[in-house]
Amino acid sequence: MLSAVIKPGINDYLGTLRVPFLLLNLSCVALGAGCAFWRRGSIDWTDALLALVGAVCAHASVNSLNEYSDFHTGVDSRTIRTPFSGGSGTLQRHPAMVGYALGIGLTCAAVTAAIGIYFVVACGWRILLVGILGLVTVSLYTPWLTRRPFLCLVAPGLGFGTCMVMGTDAVLGGDYSMAAFAASMVPFFLVSNLLLLNQFPDVEADRTGGRKNVLIVHGIRAGAAIYTLFQAGAYISVIVAVVVRILPPLSLLALLTVPLAVRTSIGAFRDGTDRDKLKPALGINVLINLLTPLLLASGLFLSR
C-alpha cells in the first residue's frame, strides 16, 4: 500500500534509460574517433560530441522501449533482478510511468534520427548505410529481433560495432575505412557477448515472455560455448588486423583484457545455471566491454 503512494524520483526517471550502461557508448564512439584520428591526424571534436549524443540517444531508446515492452509482456515481473540483468524494475514499482517509458524511448529515437539526418547532409548519403541499419536495429530489437536467436545474438554487436564505430569514423574521417571495420569487430563480438551473458539469469522469464534467444533454443552449455568463441573472436580480430597492417601495433593494447575474458568464459561454463555465482562474471563482462574498446582507441590515438 505504501509503494502505491510513493512518487517517482529522479532515479526512477533515469531508471528506464539504464544510465550506467550508457557508458558503453563513450567507449565505442571513442574507438570510432580513434580510427578517424589515426587516419587523418585531426578530427572535428564538435562532430565527435554530436556523434556521441546520437549514440547515447540510440542506446537509451532501446533500453526504454525494451522496459516498456517487458512491462507489457510481464518478462520483468518474472525475473529475479541482478545489477546487470532483469530490467531496472522501475515500471514494476511505478506502473503509471509506462507512458513515460514509451515517450522517452520514442523521443530519444527521434533525436538520433535528427542527428543522423544532419550527418547525411554534412557528409553525404553514404552515412545512410549505417544510419538505416542502426534505426532498424533500434526499432526492431525488442518486438522482433529478440524472437530470432541468431539476430538477437548479433544485433547488439551490429549496433555498437558496425553502426557506432564505423559510423563515427565515417562522419569524422570522411568515408568508411578498413581500419574502422577491423576495429568494429571488437565491440561487435564483445557487446553481443554482453547481452548474451546477461541473458543467462533470465532464461525462464524470457521463455515465458515469448522470446527466443540462443540460450532458450540451444541451452546454457551451447550459450557458454558461443560466448567463448565470441570472446576469442574479439581479440583474434585485433591480432589479424595488426599482422596485415590494417591497424597499428599499439592496437595490441586491447589484449590487456584477455585475462578478464578468460575468467568470464570459465564463469559462463561453471556458473551458467547459478545466478548468484554468475554475478562476478557479469560484472567483469561489463568491465571488458568498457575497457577493451578504450584500450584499442588509446592505441590508435597514440599511433598518430
Mark where each language-model region is.
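Functional transmembrane core segments of multi-pass inner-membrane proteins
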Residues: P156-V203, G209, R221-A225
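Topogenic membrane-insertion module of multi-pass membrane proteins
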Residues: M1-T46, L50, G54, T146-P156
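Intramembrane alpha-helical segments
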Residues: G87-D175
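Extended hydrophobic alpha-helices typical of membrane-associated regions
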Residues: V243-L302
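Multi-pass membrane catalytic core of lipid/isoprenoid biosynthesis enzymes
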Residues: I80-V120, L215-L247, V286-T292
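Small-residue-rich segments of transmembrane alpha-helices in multi-pass membrane proteins
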Residues: L23-G32, V154-D169, P187, I216-I220, ...
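Acidic (Asp/Glu-rich) catalytic motifs at the cytosolic membrane interface
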Residues: C57-T82, N193-L215
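Membrane-embedded alpha-helical segments that form the functional core of polytopic membrane enzymes
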Residues: L31, F37-L65, L129-L135, S139, ...
